[in-house]
Amino acid sequence: MVQRKLGGKHMNNQKKSFLEKVSDFVVDRLAGPMAKFGNIPAVAAVKDGLVAIVPIVIIGSLFLLIAMLGLPGTFSEDPLIPVLSSVSSRFLIFYNMTMNFLSLYAAIAIGMSYAKRFEIDSINAALLSIAAFFLININDLSNGMSVTNFAAGGLFAAIISSLISIRLYRFFLERKITIRMPDGVPANVTNAFVALIPFFVIFTLLWVVRSILNFDITSFLNTVLGPVFSGTDSIFVFIPRVLIGLLLWAVGMHGDNMIGPIFEPLKLQWVAENAKALSNGVDIKQLPHIWTTVVERITIWPAAAWGILFWMWKSKLKQARTMAGIATPAAIFTIVEPVIFGLPIVLNPFFIIPFILSGTIAAIVTYSAFSLHLINRVFVELPWATPPFISGYVATGGDWKGVLMVVINFAIGVVVYYPFWKAYEKSEKQKESNQENEQTADSSVSV
């Protein structure tokens, strides 16, 4: 027993390798806090709610793209598709009903998502969220109802109004400050009467804030937080985001899921603001924002994942070629788990450095290219699994340089991985040679 304890103590005191130390640091100092942040009910509700409205954003973006193809002065002096000229305005109506009501849809989705975590009736949650959003944004109906804040500019007000209203509703439910119905009353009727007192108090509170005190929450948030959020769309934030995301992947964490809750609301607002600016006649190379989900997708994985797949296909190692055949179809659609965990790249001393380095260099090059107005800026949101060479073309309004950027990032990955792959290949061949020698020696001994 003593020996076993001493042995365990001896094992615990063994010096950890550099990779183990890096892994422990990332897990303890980065992944742990990020996971805790992402699991906060309000944060998770915002993330899930914004994911829920992505189909609306994608469809609205595509209708804007179709409309722009029929309008002069967008991509060229003349319409790219003249036959669309007569119906472009009709496509813009569809765009306006989707993207220009983005915050309204977000308020409903986030409220329902937050309520689900507290097992609150979803219909009441949706009604409460949409009413709260109306109450904080509408103060004067004399000249009709202004929907300016319903677009991307009201997104953060929508998030806050939904979270606060649902939280207050939960407060009333937990303390049973509701109208109680007798047993046997249908559930839908019970839910309607249960909501009466909480709704009245919450609505009155929001009405007092907006109409009596004349405090515009949306304008206040945009004034205070707007410069901060706009400043986040910077190469000095984009590069650390890419680097930290790849570092998390390299130690076995899902980097995108860990960082996503921090940046998803911003990226959604930025692509919506780009779309609105384009529809208002702003030059496509001068749109206000660079950083979008599409920009991430055409940047990171063509370098960090496709680069190593190139050498896997050309390798003399049979297992590498086999893994390349398995991983490539998924990697084309930026589903990179097979190559990251299958090769593996995770905690592999040969590949951690080029994996992080290639993606980071690609991020610097890509962001710089957009900053210098060499490529049309992105105004379309696309499904996350869209192949980068397609999204690079479509999301930039048919700019071939968006595809070229994907090719350049792929080339960056190929070049960065080359010496590391050769070292890995040499090591694997040496292992195979040693195994063959051992098998030969064992055969000789047995004879």
Which sequence ranges carry the predicted segments?
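Early transmembrane hairpin of solute transport permeases
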Residues: A35-K176, V346
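Cytosolic juxtamembrane amphipathic/interface segments immediately preceding
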Residues: V27-L50, V87-S88, M181-T190, P338-I340
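Alpha-helical membrane segments and immediately flanking helix-loop junctions
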Residues: G38-P41, S103-Y114, L127, A131, ...
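Transmembrane alpha-helical segments and their short flanking loops
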Residues: N12-F37, S76, I81, S85, ...
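Membrane-interface helix-loop-helix junctions at boundaries between adjacent transmembrane segments
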Residues: S122, L135-F236
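Generic multipass alpha-helical transmembrane bundles of integral membrane proteins
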Residues: F200-K318, A324-A327
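Inter-helical loop and helix-membrane interface segments of multi-pass membrane transporters/permeases
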Residues: A67-F94, I120, A131-G153, P182-G184, ...
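Alpha-helical transmembrane segments in multi-pass membrane proteins
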Residues: I59, S103, A107, G111, ...
